[in-house]
Swiss-Prot record:
HAMAP family: Glu_tRNA_synth_type1. It catalyses: tRNA(Glu) + L-glutamate + ATP = L-glutamyl-tRNA(Glu) + AMP + diphosphate. A motif ('KMSKS' region) lies at residues 240-244. This is Glutamate--tRNA ligase 1. It comes from the Bacteria. Signal peptide: none annotated. The keyword Aminoacyl-tRNA synthetase applies. ATP binds at residue 243. Gene3D superfamilies: 1.10.10.350, HUPs. Keywords: Aminoacyl-tRNA synthetase, ATP-binding, Cytoplasm, Ligase, Nucleotide-binding, Protein biosynthesis. One of its GO terms (cellular component) is cytoplasm. The keyword ATP-binding applies. Transmembrane segments: none annotated.
């Protein structure tokens, strides 16, 4: 049986966003589900926009999400190989030279659109005479090269979309080699997939027409194409998510929003599938339950608040031994099990635990809250003398209610504000033992 090999091929022209990390996750999960390999490839042939800092950031995001790769390479290291294939396809008459300028091509495109026609290249370059070509060369024009798409039906069985069919005549011959000699994504990707024996490719449905053309490229190289799966796009309200939209970068979710890796991995590996989106603590659990056939063909709506809720669900499920190392990573190794269990139910982000530590160990500033000082003084006097435990709050407030005739918010809220500086948070009955008696009295008086 053929070994499953998948790949993730980002362009290092920006940060990873939730759309392409979803593709990375599903390719990784599919490979691991079938005891296969996962390859990281950098599509860096766009010399002007590709940057080393983006490569480093992409690696950091993948490592954060525990998406370890078995091999990695970048396309710039394979230029001589691409040149070999260029010569082969020229000999096979599947590549042809074109001499139009970008301005001329844009005029053609606008003319076609004005006539209600699809902007498909008219293959004028195939009819150039030797004299015309020589004239272009004398003008200093350098050729770009297009791949000749056969005008025949292109069909494949998609892992998600089912049977897909394209008419070759409805596709425009893509530019695969630019006038400066650099190669575009389309052909390089196919050459890499052949050489690295990629068996399965899972990517967004915005690549479907590319897939139709690339299947012909595989055939032109006398190779079988991989099995493809095209994911429905992630949309936020009315906008497709991409790196140009911004605001959905994995680095932002990690560093600024403060979400856990397994919350992000759980959410985006299940989003758009028929499976219930629940937090998983380990990648092995996601691998075990992963089924590519469960993904829908319909667009998937991404609501950031859903991801944040999942992060909360993950945190409240973590025992202290499961979160201890993460606390060290955020410089909160001073948090012990008792404190963790007390504040855990109210944590939206792990960093919130540090905030609650500060609240319990540093007197909050409540000068601007206009609290009833007489009531707080009375509360301090009625604080039980016994050791402060989780039972203290109930005993204390019951006594206060009897003496002051206060109840509900009027009874509890001033105490919470005085003790924590916040209107909401962990149960005060659990927080109270974390604050020293002297500190409780100090905050009340």
């Amino acid at each position: 049986m053929t070994k499953v090999i998948t790949r993730f091929a980002p362009s290092p022209t920006g940060m990873l966003h939730v759309g392409n990390i979803r593709a990375a996750l599903l390719n990784w999960l599919y490979a691991k589900k079938h005891d296969g390999q996962f390859i990281l490839r950098f599509d860096d042939t766009d010399l002007e926009r590709s940057k080393q800092e983006y490569k480093d950031a992409i690696r950091a995001d993948l490592k954060f999400l525990n998406l370890n790769w078995d091999q990695t390479f970048n396309q710039l290291s394979r230029l001589s190989r691409y040149d070999e294939i260029k010569k082969l396809l020229l000999d096979k008459k599947r590549l042809y030279a074109c001499y139009e300028t970008p301005e001329e091509l844009e005029l053609k495109r606008k003319f076609q659109l004005s006539k209600g026609l699809p902007p498909i290249y008219d293959r004028a370059a195939l009819n150039l005479t030797e004299d015309q070509i020589q004239k272009y060369i004398e003008q200093g024009r350098k050729p770009h090269y297009r791949f000749l798409v056969n005008h025949e039906p292109i069909t494949w069985h998609d892992m998600i979309k089912g049977e897909v069919k394209y008419e070759g005549k409805a596709l425009s011959d893509p530019i695969v080699i630019r006038a400066d000699g650099s190669m575009t994504y389309m052909l390089c990707s196919v050459i890499d997939d052949v050489d690295y024996e990629i068996t399965h490719i899972i990517r967004g449905e915005d690549h479907v027409s590319n897939t139709a053309i690339q299947i012909q490229m595989f055939e032109a190289l006398d190779k079988y194409p991989p099995t493809f799966g095209h994911l429905s796009l992630i949309i936020n309200k009315d906008e497709k998510i991409s790196k140009r939209v911004g605001g959905f970068e994995i680095a932002t979710l990690r560093e600024e929003v403060g979400l856990e890796a397994m919350a992000i991995a759980s959410f985006f590996s299940l989003l758009g599938s028929s499976a219930q989106i629940i937090p998983h603590k380990k990648m092995d659990e996601l691998v075990k339950h992963f089924e590519i056939s469960s993904f829908s063909k319909s667009p998937t709506i991404y609501q950031p608040e859903d991801l944040e809720r999942l992060n909360h669900k993950l945190l409240i499920s973590l025992e202290f031994n499961e979160v201890k190392d993460r606390l060290k990573e955020i410089d909160a190794e001073y948090i012990d099990e008792n404190f963790w269990l007390s504040v855990r139910p109210n944590l939206k982000k792990l960093f919130d635990a540090k905030d609650w530590w500060e609240i319990c160990h540093k007197t909050p500033n409540i000068q601007d809250l206009n609290l009833d000082k007489e009531y707080l003084k009375q509360a301090a006097e009625l604080l039980p003398e016994e050791e402060i435990t989780t039972e203290t709050w109930g005993i204390w407030t019951k006594k206060l209610a009897a003496i002051t005739n206060r109840k509900g918010k009027e009874l509890f809220l001033p105490l919470r504000l005085a003790l924590t500086g916040k209107e909401s948070g962990p149960e005060i009955s659990k927080v109270l033992p974390l604050i020293k008696r002297e500190e409780i009295v100090k905050r009340l008086t």
